């Protein structure tokens, strides 16, 4: 297949119908609200006064919040300039973190789950002694997310998603006790059918199988009877945050995690979902670049905990009476590798942006180079400052983004960040064969990350995410080498974005950037 070949993106009929129905319902709700407001003209002064008071309260609350200025400013402007729309949107999606009830549920589950992980203090001391800058980051993760650092874990890096899928299928066939799978998107098509065939066989062998997916991420890929179909063949299946019309303060928080756990001994994570395009079975955006890792050993416990958190959080019953002990246990394993690995999770239910802080910490600690690959580049002032400051210090800072976008508007917003970065020495590359969906970073030949966390507001602030911090292991070298190979297939657009832009383009980009935090 030629690199520039593009194919239509397959969609399931029922999924598309449900999406269209939901959108129509939401539009009708908006029309209804506007109609009600219009008919209440006789109370215009009272409504106007109430809206202004509420707007003032929300703006003061935003000002006093711990959010970054990049997150506050769009909402402040929207609320002050368009009070009714701004207040409505902020109450719907801007609160970020759902209801108090949901926060309590997650806190309750975490209070039971996370203490079951060993603090591995000796391992933490070891990394602080041998690689202090990586140790600082590991300490931050452990103190603020309670996910420990591990050794005694073998890591396999996959530079193509299809290699990860092939390895997963082999390991799934060996499952004896349980299989946990959590993904943002599942497509009821060829790639999933390969997995489903194996899962059915393992169910017949007495293996407990759980599948968990995000409704919004999968809405165009699977039909509404998917859960019922899974349950019929013995697979326990749950849906995260079903997308329905109506007021839903939790709507904007999606499960973007990608995890497979087999018997608590083997785990997979990375950037790819379980849909055909991720494995280049179809090509809606040219070639697809995605990556992943396989863990075997002690560190898999953290992936198990991350899965159990989400699985139990969607059920009030499970949140109150969970039984985790049979899935979290120690077993004898002698790893061939000696490096450090730290799977971690990030949640919008707290006020700690673990994903962003790990990236910024790597940038700040880097002395020679710090490279990133991301499908989207929509970042806060804090991260922009860190990237630019590192480049000014003489650190080789590079970012790889797609050459063919999956969302053109978001792509334009991504490109709007280029000029502000390259003028300070950051180099930007666009992968010409297609869409790079991988989320990776590497610095100074000693530390790297691989996981689900994009360099955009949605991943860093709104979504449930997971990543894996690695230090002093072969996977770090392999990630660096993969990025070097990938850059060889890129166009270097650094010089192109050094020059000034037209007033019209600057105005358009300023508008897009202003509301980037809402994307």
What is each residue range found by the language model?
Residues 1-357, 361, 405, 419-424, ...:
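N-terminal localization/anchoring segments of enzymes in phospholipid and broader phosphate metabolism
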Residues 355-372, 392:
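Long hydrophobic segments that form regular secondary structure
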Residues 373-374, 401, 431, 450-451:
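Thr-Gly-centered strand-to-loop micro-motif
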Residues 376-397, 402, 407:
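Helical hairpin unit composed of two closely spaced alpha helices linked by a short loop
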Residues 427:
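Surface segments flanking catalytic/ligand-binding clefts of nucleic-acid enzymes
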């Amino acid at each position: 297949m030629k690199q520039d070949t593009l194919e239509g993106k397959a969609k399931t009929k029922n999924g598309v119908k449900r999406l269209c129905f939901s959108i129509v319902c939401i539009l009708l709700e908006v029309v209804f609200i506007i109609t009600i407001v219009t008919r209440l003209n006789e109370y215009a002064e009272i409504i106007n006064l109430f809206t202004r008071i509420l707007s003032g309260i929300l703006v003061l609350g935003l000002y006093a919040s711990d959010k970054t200025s990049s997150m506050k400013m769009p909402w402040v402007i929207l609320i002050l300039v368009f009070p009714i729309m701004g207040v409505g949107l902020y109450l719907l999606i801007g609160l970020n973190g759902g209801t108090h009830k949901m926060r309590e549920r997650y806190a309750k589950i975490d209070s039971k789950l996370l203490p079951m992980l060993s603090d591995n203090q000796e391992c933490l001391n070891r990394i602080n002694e041998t690689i202090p800058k990586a140790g600082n980051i590991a300490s931050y993760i452990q103190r603020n997310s309670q996910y420990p650092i591990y050794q005694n874990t073998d890591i396999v890096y996959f530079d193509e998603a299809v290699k990860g899928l092939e390895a997963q299928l082999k390991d799934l066939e060996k499952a004896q006790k349980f299989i946990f799978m959590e993904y943002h998107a599942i497509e009821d098509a060829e790639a999933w059918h390969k997995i489903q065939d194996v899962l059915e066989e393992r169910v017949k062998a007495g293996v407990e199988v759980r599948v968990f997916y995000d409704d919004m991420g999968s809405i165009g890929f699977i039909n509404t009877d998917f859960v019922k179909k899974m349950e019929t063949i013995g697979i326990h299946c749950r849906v995260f945050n079903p997308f329905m019309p109506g007021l839903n303060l939790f709507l904007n928080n999606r499960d973007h995690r990608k995890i497979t756990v087999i018997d608590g001994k083997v785990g997979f994570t990375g950037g790819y979902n379980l849909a055909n395009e991720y494995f280049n079975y179809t090509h809606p955006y040219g070639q697809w670049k995605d990556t992943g890792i396989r863990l075997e050993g002690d560190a898999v416990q953290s992936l198990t905990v991350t899965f159990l958190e989400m699985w139990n959080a969607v059920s009030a019953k499970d949140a109150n009476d969970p039984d985790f002990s049979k899935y979290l246990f120690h077993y004898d394993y002698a790893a061939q590798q000696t490096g450090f690995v730290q799977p971690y999770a990030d949640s919008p239910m707290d006020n700690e942006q673990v994903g962003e802080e790990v990236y910024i910490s790597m940038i700040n600690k880097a002395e020679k180079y710090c490279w990133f690959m991301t499908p989207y580049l929509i970042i806060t002032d804090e991260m922009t400052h860190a990237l630019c400051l590192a480049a000014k210090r003489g650190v080789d800072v590079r970012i790889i983004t797609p050459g063919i976008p999956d969302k053109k508007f978001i792509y334009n917003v991504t490109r709007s960040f280029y000029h502000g970065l390259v003028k300070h020495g950051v180099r930007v590359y666009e992968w010409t064969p297609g869409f790079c969906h991988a989320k990776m970073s590497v610095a100074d030949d000693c530390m790297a990350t691989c996981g689900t966390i994009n360099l955009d507001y949605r991943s860093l602030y709104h979504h449930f995410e997971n990543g894996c911090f690695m230090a002093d292991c072969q996977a770090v070298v392999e990630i660096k080498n993969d990025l070097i190979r990938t850059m060889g297939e890129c166009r270097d657009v650094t010089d192109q974005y050094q020059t000034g832009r037209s007033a019209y383009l600057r105005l358009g980009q300023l508008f897009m950037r202003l509301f980037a935090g809402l994307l």
